[in-house]
């Protein structure tokens, strides 16, 4: 029942913003009337709120209408706890209250800027003519359509962006596969290029070797006659060495005693050899008879012969070793003589042919350019024994 009392108490507020309640100046019969605290509001706030809404202050004897005058006013007021309670409690009959004077907490929570904009819009709407109102409604409808269109376009753009992302992922995967294939192909081509380069370098080297061989063949083409003459001279040198082998000087060979002592030591061995050759019917009978006569004249000749045979065997072994050493020395001397003969023939040929002709057989064209006659004389002097 508190709502009914509040409704009854709120009716005198419709007399105006500057009106004083009538209960103060009149005597109430039949009881005492207590002033409601609900009506203790700030008069200045009420005037400002009424002026902001563009309404005329209510006069005495006329009740102010509490029904919202437009959709904007209902939007501005919102749904407060007081209004919802009254609507739920009384159904379709709204209370006859001036809600403009109520200091509602839900209204105070709204931003001041929004209140000013909505108040200005309501005021301008209430002051416009009908054609201007229609234009304003049309603009609002156009604005709503534009917003709907922008929302639909935003949705389409979102769908397109999702589709683009999916396509981009597929393209990235495909590009990675193509890139891997290209890398494998690049490696294969690099290996093939390296193999071809190696083959090319090998062919170039073979061509250079063939050119060098051709140049050497051209340089050595006049040498066969000289080679034949060298062979003949070498054979002559070999025959000369064979004929003069026993007259060559012996060096670095240790021999005890002189030549006569060696001959005296060889005499008994030669006699034993002569006897053995006679026994084998190789020696002449006279020599064998002389040996036998000498053996019969001297007593103990058989024992001496045995001793001589033993000595002969020892001497043969020693002479065999000495002959081996002598043969090795003779071979070494022969090689040195051949070397000296070859160097002599080479020097003679170089002097006969000249420096330029002889340098063609020893040096390449690049070396021949830097080769001077002074170096030729130095080389020839170093080759002389």
From Swiss-Prot:
Regions of compositional bias (Basic and acidic residues) in chain numbering: 1-10, 53-75
Subunit structure: Component of the HAUS augmin-like complex. The complex interacts with the gamma-tubulin ring complex and this interaction is required for spindle assembly. Associates with microtubules. The interaction with microtubules is strong during mitosis, while it is weak or absent during interphase. It is unclear whether this interaction is direct or indirect. Interacts with EML3 (phosphorylated form) and TUBG1.
Entry's localization field: Cytoplasm; Cytoplasm, Cytoskeleton, Microtubule organizing center, Centrosome; Cytoplasm, Cytoskeleton, Spindle; Cytoplasm, Cytoskeleton, Spindle pole
GO cellular component: centrosome; cytoplasm; HAUS complex; mitotic spindle microtubule; nuclear microtubule; spindle pole
Gene designation: Haus8
Family under the similarity heading: Belongs to the HAUS8 family.
An example molecular function term from Gene Ontology annotations: microtubule binding
Modified residues (N-acetylalanine): 2
Lineage: Eukaryota, Metazoa, Chordata, Craniata, Vertebrata
Role played: Contributes to mitotic spindle assembly, maintenance of centrosome integrity and completion of cytokinesis as part of the HAUS augmin-like complex.
Record's keyword terms, sorted: Acetylation, Cell cycle, Cell division, Coiled coil, Cytoplasm, Cytoskeleton, Microtubule, Mitosis, Phosphoprotein
Region annotation Disordered: where it falls in the sequence: 1-78, 107-128, 356-385
Protein name according to UniProt: HAUS augmin-like complex subunit 8
Major subcellular site: cytoplasm
Biological process (GO), any one: cell division
Chain intervals with Polar residues compositional bias: 375-385
Modified residues (Phosphoserine): 100
Species: Rattus norvegicus
Ranges in coiled-coil conformation: 131-248
């Amino acid at each position: 029942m508190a709502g009914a009392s509040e409704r009854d108490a709120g009716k005198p507020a419709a007399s105006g913003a500057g009106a004083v309640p009538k209960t103060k100046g009149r005597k109430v019969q039949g009881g005492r009337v207590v002033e409601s605290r609900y009506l203790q509001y700030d008069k200045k706030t009420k005037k400002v709120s009424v002026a902001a809404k563009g309404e005329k202050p209510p006069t005495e004897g006329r009740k102010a209408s509490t029904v919202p005058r437009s959709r904007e006013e209902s939007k501005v007021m919102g749904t407060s706890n007081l209004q919802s309670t009254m609507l739920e409690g009384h159904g379709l009959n709204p209370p006859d209250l001036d809600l403009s004077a109520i200091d509602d907490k839900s209204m105070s929570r709204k931003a001041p800027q929004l209140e000013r904009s909505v108040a200005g819009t309501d005021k301008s709407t209430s002051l416009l003519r009908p054609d201007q109102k229609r234009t304003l409604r049309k603009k609002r409808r156009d604005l709503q359509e534009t917003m709907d269109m922008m929302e639909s376009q935003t949705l389409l753009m979102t769908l397109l962006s999702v589709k683009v992302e999916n396509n981009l992922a597929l393209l990235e995967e495909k590009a990675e596969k193509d890139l891997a294939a290209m890398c494998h192909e690049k490696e294969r081509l690099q290996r093939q290029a390296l193999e071809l380069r190696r083959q090319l370098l090998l062919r170039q080297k073979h061509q250079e070797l063939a050119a060098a061989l051709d140049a050497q063949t051209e340089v050595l083409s006049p040498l066969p006659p000289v080679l034949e003459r060298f062979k003949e001279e070498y054979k002559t040198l070999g025959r000369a060495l064979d004929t003069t082998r026993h007259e060559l000087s012996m060096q670095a060979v240790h021999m005890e005693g002189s030549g006569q002592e060696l001959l005296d030591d060889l005499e008994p061995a030669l006699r034993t050899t002569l006897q053995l050759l006679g026994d084998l019917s190789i020696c002449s009978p006279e020599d064998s008879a002389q040996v036998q006569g000498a053996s019969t004249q001297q007593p103990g000749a058989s024992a001496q012969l045995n001793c001589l045979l033993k000595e002969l065997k020892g001497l043969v072994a020693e002479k065999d070793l000495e002959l081996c050493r002598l043969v090795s020395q003779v071979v070494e001397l022969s090689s040195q003589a051949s070397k000296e003969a070859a160097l002599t023939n080479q020097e003679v040929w170089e002097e006969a042919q000249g420096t330029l002709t002889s340098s063609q057989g020893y040096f390449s064209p690049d070396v021949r350019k830097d080769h001077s006659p002074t170096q030729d004389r130095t080389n020839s002097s170093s080759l002389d024994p």
